[in-house]
Amino acid sequence: PNNPTGSILNINELKEIAKVCIEKDLYVISDEIYCELTYEGEHASIVQVEGMKERTILINGFSKSYAMTGWRLGYATGPKEIIAQMTKIHQYAIMCAPTTSQYAAVEALAHGDEDVAKMRESYNQRRRFLLHKFDELGMTCFEPQGAFYVFPSIKRFNMTSEEFATRLLEEQKTAIVPGTAFGASGEGYVRVSYAYSMERLKEAISRIEKFVRSLS
């Protein structure tokens, strides 16, 4: 799943990317930090495509799926010769992740699947809530298939995403991220995270609604 839109690539789209990579002899770095937070269907990875396992460096971690953001623990898998060179840099730049974090990660992998499933269902409920609310406000919103963000359009308000986000913060004390934080093509959109309680989201959307109504 993508940040900020929550969109995903299906296996057929990944196969098309793989064709180009194999033809041009390219390596792929695939950041799959949100893979466990896929709401509809199964997560697809480019390493599943024939011929791509040996040319893909897959990056993942525990921050999103296990809500271990502060533990700063991640991992990478890939071709042996590349991982060997990555290890040389890593061991002298960082040495290793704290042992406490490593033990916590082992427990998460061994016993955390049920918690991940519950968290995913909770995110899904919040996702549906925000999609419905933004639809009511007339803010067109792509339906995210993963992660925990929505990316509604603000184009009808005739202001930049930076201005919209700044004014919302100043006037309603509610923080969102302007779409341009993710590149020029994000202009006209804002990112809203639903990695909060439903109670907080209801308050946030109420403030966003007040702000939007004031622009009419």
Where are these regions (language model features)?
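PLP-dependent class I/II
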Residues: 1-216
